[in-house]
Design a protein with these regions (language model features):
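Face-selective signature of the C-terminal outer-membrane beta-barrel domain
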Residues: 1-78, 82, 86-88, 146, ...
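Transmembrane beta-strands of outer-membrane beta-barrel pores
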Residues: 17-19, 28-34, 67-73, 99-105, ...
Length: 307
């Protein structure tokens, strides 16, 4: 059994001036976990990000440099800069590009999970990466189309590996990973029976090239994501209520596609927002990259307040 909790505070602010628009954000969180498998764990996190958007040639060109600084009590301080560039070719047609560094700390599952086939590794190091992306966006009223291609180079990849077929799978930082991807997104708003609807359709294709490893058996190599298709539908039933569903179809290297359905209900009351979610409504049995089974049907209730 797992009991997890997260307590946090997030503050975001934007400032506009004759020099452009600045953004600042702070996120502080405490994460706690009690598990009969992972043990009792705690993690403190602090995130600070700063960015500034410059406009040139009558807002036809935008350049947005930024940096994020992250602290985890068990992994220390790290920073990862990035930059976005956009160019409006003609009205409603824009090309963009971005590049930046990414950073992912090991999860409690990566560090401490144990079962009859798998063990974690408390000595794992964070994954790091560098991503480059170029894309184009077309807007016509409420109809938006976005197409993009990206390349990601990751190091210290966390993978589950073993030397012999009879060994247990163990988490290790073992390889470099180069990923090429294509993304497409179509979304629009429309009305049916005086109710506001919003639909989003997205598709992602990924091609991974795993660096040479001295270990012959790799979970990532046999279970990396290849195709990911998502449909999102939201309906506003008035000023206060919104319902939504998300249907996800995924196919991995091992060739076992699966579908996951999530439902949500939002109720807005003044500055308060209450959200109820049912994830994996159909209790689909599936695993993510690390082959650890994901939860069956489960619920989440969140409360938010706007200052």
């Amino acid at each position: 059994m797992h009991i997890s909790n997260k307590t946090g505070l997030a503050i975001d602010a934007t400032f506009s001036s004759s020099f452009g628009k600045s953004g600042l954000g702070i996120d502080v969180a405490h994460i706690g976990l009690k598990s009969n498998n992972l043990g009792t764990r705690k993690r403190q996190q602090f995130l600070l990000f700063v960015e500034h958007q410059f406009w040139f040639y009558n807002h036809q060109i935008s350049v947005t440099p930024g940096i994020a600084v992250n602290y985890f009590n068990d992994f220390g301080w790290h920073n990862f800069p990035g930059m976005d560039v956009g160019l409006e070719i003609v009205p409603n047609l824009r090309i963009y590009g971005n590049l930046g560094y990414t950073y992912r700390v090991p999860t409690f599952t990566d560090l401490f999970y144990q079962d009859r086939t798998t063990i974690g590794n408390k000595n794992l190091e964070p994954e790091t990466g560098f991503t480059k992306e170029i894309g184009v966006q077309m807007t016509r009223g409420k109809f938006i189309v976005n197409l993009a291609a990206f390349d990601r180079q990751a190091s210290n990849l966390i993978d589950y590996v073993k030397e012999k077929e009879t060994d247990l799978w163990q988490a290790n930082n073992i390889a470099l990973l180069n990923t090429f991807g294509l993304e497409g997104l179509v979304k629009t708003d429309y009305r049916i029976f005086q109710k506001q609807h919003r639909i989003e359709i997205a598709y992602t294709y990924l091609k991974d090239e795993l660096g040479q490893s001295t270990l012959p058996f790799s979970r990532y190599a046999i279970n990396s994501l290849k195709h990911h298709f998502i449909i999102k539908q939201f309906i506003e039933w008035g000023a206060q209520f919104t319902t939504g569903f998300v249907l996800k179809h995924a196919e991995r290297t091992q060739g076992n596609p699966y579908q996951v359905l999530d439902l949500s209900l939002d109720w807005r009351f003044g500055k308060w927002t209450f959200r109820g979610q049912i994830n994996n409504l159909l209790s689909t049995r599936y695993s993510e990259t690390n082959l650890v089974p994901m939860p069956l049907a489960n619920g989440l209730l969140t409360v938010g307040y706007d200052f």
